[in-house]
C-alpha cells in the first residue's frame, strides 16, 4: 500500500558554503531515505531551505560591508549549488526570507497566542556593550550552573543537556569579541512549555522506535522544562503579529521559532508552485502520513521539544486547551533522526582555522558519489566519526573501485566481448542459484534497514553481495570458459547470472549512489532516466499568503530553489530482469582509483594537517 512520507531536512544556516561536516549529518542520510521511499512506491515530499534570520548573519554582514539581505542571497545561492551538486533530491529547497514563510510563521504564532501558550513576560536580555546589539543565546558561553562544565551555551549545556538562559551562566562572555555582556530588562513573548509538558511527555513516551540517544536526550529535557523566549530585540527577522508589536522593527520572532516552521511553510510553497495549493495537507493533516526529521545532534531540542510543542499548542492540546488553527491539526514527527558529528583528522570543522573541506571543492575533484559513499559507510550515524584522507582513499579504492566498479566492468566487458549482448542462459547450477538467492534476499533485508534509517547496515549488506558476486566470478572463471567452445552455454549462464546480480546491486545502491546508478543502468543497455537528479529553478517571491508588519520580504525578489521531477524516474525497489538479447557496449571505467599518496598528503585545497 502506498504511504505518504514527509522528509523534513534541517535548514542549513546561510552563513557560508557547505562543508562535508554539514552534509554528513542531515544531507546525505535524508536523501538516501527519500530516494528509497520513492523507489518503494511511496508518495514522498522532501523539503528544506536556508535559514536566514538571527544575529549571526547581521554580524557577518557588518564584517563584509553588505546588507544582510545581499549576504543571505549570496550564501543561499552557494548552498543551493552545493546541495544540487551532491544530488540531494528535494521536492523543494527554499529559504526563510519569503513572504510565504513569514505568513505561515505568523499564523502559527497567532494560533499559539490565541490559545494562551504565548505569554508576555519581562526577561533579562544580553546586550553587547560595544555595539548595543542583542547577543543571541548561542553567542554567549560560560560555565553551566547545573553541572559546572565550561563552554555551556546561553540556550543549552551540551554536557548535561539542560536548557539554560544566558543570565544563568557563570562568567558569561560573548563568542563574538570576548566581552562580558550586559543584561537589561526587556519584554518578550515566551512559549509556555510547562503548559504543554503533559502532552509532550505523553507523545514522547510513545516514540519507542526512535534512536536510543535521541529518545533519552529528549525525555531528559522534560526534567527542567520552562518557558522559552520566542521573540528577540533585533531588527532582522519576522514581525510579531500582535497589535502594538507588528510595527515595532526592533523586536522580531526568535530565529528558532521561525526555522522549525519552515518544514510546514516549505510544504505549502511546494504545493503552490506545483499548481495544487492544498496538496500540502496530505502530508500535514492526514494522520496516516509518516514524517521524518533529519538533523545533527545539536538540533534535537528544537525538533523533539520546541516544534512539537508549537504543533500541540496550535491544536489546543495543552493544559489550557484552545481552538484548532486555520491550518488544521498538524502532524507531530513520526521520528527525529539525529546524527552525531563528523570531525576532520580529530578536529572539529572550522572555516576560520582552516579545518574544513568544502563540498564544492570535493565535488569538483571527486564527484558526488564518492562523498555520498563515504558518508554512508563511515559517517556519524550513531557516533562521532572522523574523516581522514587516508580512510577516504582506502574506501574508494578498495570498496568502490576494486569492489563495485570491478564487478560491473569485468562482467559487462566479458559479456560484450563474447556475446555483444546479454546472453541466453542455460540451466542454472547450484552456485548460480546461490548468488541469485543472496541478491534476492538482500532486497528485503536492505529495505528493512533503510526503512529504519539504518543506512550503514543497509549499504554494508549490499557491499557484501558485491563481494560474494566477485567471488562467484573468480570461482567460475569465465575467462577460461571463453576459451572452450564446448563450454559456451556455461559461459552464457555464468555471465547472465553475474549481469543479473549487477543489476540487483545497482538497484539497491541507487539511493546511495544515484549518479553511478544511472551510468550502470546505461551500461546494461537500458534507456531512460533511472535515478532523477534535482534541478535549480529561478523563482519569484510569490505567495499564497501575505504577512503583516514592518520589514517584510520584497514580493518581486527572485531566488533559486531546488526542485525535481522524481515521479517519472524508472528506479523501483525490485528485481529488474536482465533480458537476453539486450545490446551491450564496451563499458568505460565506472570508478577511477585514487593515488594512494593522496591519503598521506590530501589535495592542495585541503592538505593533511601535521
From Swiss-Prot:
GO terms for cellular component: cytosol. HAMAP family: Met_tRNA_synth_type1. One of its GO terms (biological process) is methionyl-tRNA aminoacylation. Is required not only for elongation of protein synthesis but also for the initiation of all mRNA translation through initiator tRNA(fMet) aminoacylation. Monomer. It catalyses: tRNA(Met) + L-methionine + ATP = L-methionyl-tRNA(Met) + AMP + diphosphate. Its main location: cytoplasm. GO terms for molecular function: ATP binding; metal ion binding; methionine-tRNA ligase activity. This is Methionine--tRNA ligase. It comes from Corynebacterium glutamicum (strain R). Its EC number is 6.1.1.10. A motif ('KMSKS' region) lies at residues 348-352. Zn(2+) binds at residues 144, 147, 157, 160. It comes from the Bacteria. The gene is metG. Keywords: Aminoacyl-tRNA synthetase, ATP-binding, Cytoplasm, Ligase, Metal-binding, Nucleotide-binding, Protein biosynthesis, Zinc.
Amino acid at each position: 500500500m502506498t504511504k505518504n512520507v514527509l522528509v523534513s531536512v534541517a535548514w542549513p544556516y546561510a552563513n557560508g558554503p557547505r562543508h562535508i561536516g554539514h552534509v554528513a549529518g542531515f544531507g546525505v542520510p535524508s536523501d538516501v531515505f527519500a530516494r528509497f521511499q520513492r523507489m518503494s512506491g511511496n508518495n514522498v515530499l522532501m523539503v528544506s531551505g536556508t535559514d536566514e534570520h538571527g544575529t549571526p548573519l547581521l554580524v557577518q554582514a557588518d564584517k563584509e560591508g553588505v546588507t544582510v539581505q545581499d549576504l543571505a542571497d549570496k550564501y543561499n545561492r552557494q548552498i543551493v549549488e552545493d546541495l544540487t551538486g551532491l544530488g540531494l533530491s528535494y521536492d523543494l529547497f527554499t529559504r526563510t526570507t519569503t513572504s510565504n514563510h513569514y505568513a505561515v510563521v505568523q499564523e502559527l504564532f497567532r494560533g499559539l497566542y490565541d490559545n494562551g501558550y504565548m505569554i508576555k513576560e519581562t526577561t533579562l536580555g544580553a546586550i553587547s556593550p560595544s555595539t548595543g546589539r542583542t547577543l543571541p543565546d548561542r553567542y554567549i558561553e560560560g560555565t553551566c550552573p547545573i553541572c559546572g562544565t565550561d563552554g555551556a551555551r546561553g540556550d543549552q549545556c551540551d554536557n548535561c543537556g539542560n536548557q539554560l538562559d544566558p543570565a544563568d551562566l557563570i562568567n558569561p562572555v560573548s563568542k563574538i569579541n570576548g566581552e562580558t555582556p550586559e543584561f537589561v530588562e526587556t519584554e518578550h513573548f515566551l512559549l509556555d512549555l510547562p503548559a504543554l509538558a503533559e502532552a509532550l511527555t505523553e507523545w514522547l513516551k510513545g516514540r519507542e522506535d526512535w534512536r536510543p540517544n535521541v529518545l533519552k536526550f529528549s525525555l531528559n529535557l522534560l526534567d527542567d522544562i520552562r518557558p522559552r523566549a520566542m521573540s528577540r530585540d533585533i531588527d532582522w527577522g519576522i514581525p510579531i503579529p500582535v497589535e502594538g508589536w507588528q510595527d515595532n522593527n526592533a523586536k522580531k520572532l526568535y530565529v528558532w521559532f521561525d526555522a522549525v516552521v519552515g518544514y510546514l511553510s516549505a510544504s505549502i510553497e511546494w504545493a503552490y508552485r506545483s499548481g495544487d495549493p492544498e496538496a500540502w495537507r496530505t502530508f500535514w493533516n492526514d494522520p496516516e502520513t509518516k514524517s521524518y526529521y533529519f538533523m545533527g545532534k545539536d538540533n534535537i531540542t528544537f525538533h523533539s521539544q520546541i516544534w512539537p510543542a508549537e504543533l500541540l499548542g496550535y491544536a489546543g492540546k495543552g493544559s489550557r486547551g484552545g481552538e484548532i488553527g486555520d491550518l488544521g491539526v498538524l502532524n507531530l514527527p513520526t521520528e527525529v533522526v539525529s546524527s552525531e558529528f563528523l570531525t576532520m583528522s580529530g578536529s572539529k570543522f572550522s572555516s576560520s582555522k582552516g579545518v574544513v573541506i568544502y563540498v564544492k571543492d570535493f565535488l569538483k575533484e571527486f564527484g558526488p558519489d564518492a562523498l555520498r559513499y563515504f558518508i554512508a559507510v563511515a559517517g556519524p550515524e550513531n557516533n562521532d566519526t572522523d574523516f581522514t584522507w587516508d580512510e577516504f582513499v582506502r574506501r574508494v579504492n578498495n570498496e568502490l573501485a576494486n569492489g563495485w566498479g570491478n564487478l560491473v566492468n569485468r562482467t559487462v566487458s566479458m559479456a560484450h566481448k563474447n556475446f555483444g549482448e546479454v546472453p541466453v542462459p542455460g540451466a542454472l547450477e547450484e552456485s548460480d542459484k546461490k548468488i541469485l538467492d543472496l541478491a534476492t534476499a538482500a532486497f528485503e533485508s536492505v529495505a528493512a534497514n533503510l526503512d529504519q534509517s539504518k543506512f550503514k547496515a543497509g549499504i554494508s549488506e549490499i557491499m557484501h553481495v558485491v563481494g560474494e558476486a566477485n567471488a562467484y566470478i573468480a570461482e567460475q572463471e569465465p575467462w577460461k570458459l571463453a576459451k572452450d567452445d564446448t563450454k559456451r552455454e556455461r559461459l552464457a549462464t555464468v555471465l547472465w547470472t553475474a549481469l543479473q546480480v549487477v543489476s540487483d546491486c545497482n538497484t539497491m545502491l541507487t539511493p546511495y549512489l544515484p549518479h553511478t546508478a544511472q551510468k550502470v543502468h546505461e551500461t546494461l543497455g537500458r534507456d531512460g532516466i533511472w535515478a532523477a537528479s534535482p534541478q535549480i529553478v529561478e523563482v519569484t517571491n510569490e505567495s499564497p499568503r501575505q504577512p503583516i508588519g514592518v520589514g517584510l520580504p520584497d514580493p518581486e525578489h527572485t531566488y533559486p530553489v531546488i526542485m525535481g521531477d522524481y515521479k517519472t524516474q524508472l528506479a523501483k525497489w525490485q528485481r529488474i530482469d536482465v533480458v537476453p538479447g539486450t545490446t551491450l557496449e564496451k563499458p568505460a571505467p565506472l570508478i577511477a582509483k585514487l593515488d594512494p599518496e593522496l591519503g598521506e598528503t590530501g589535495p592542495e585545497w585541503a592538505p593533511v594537517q601535521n
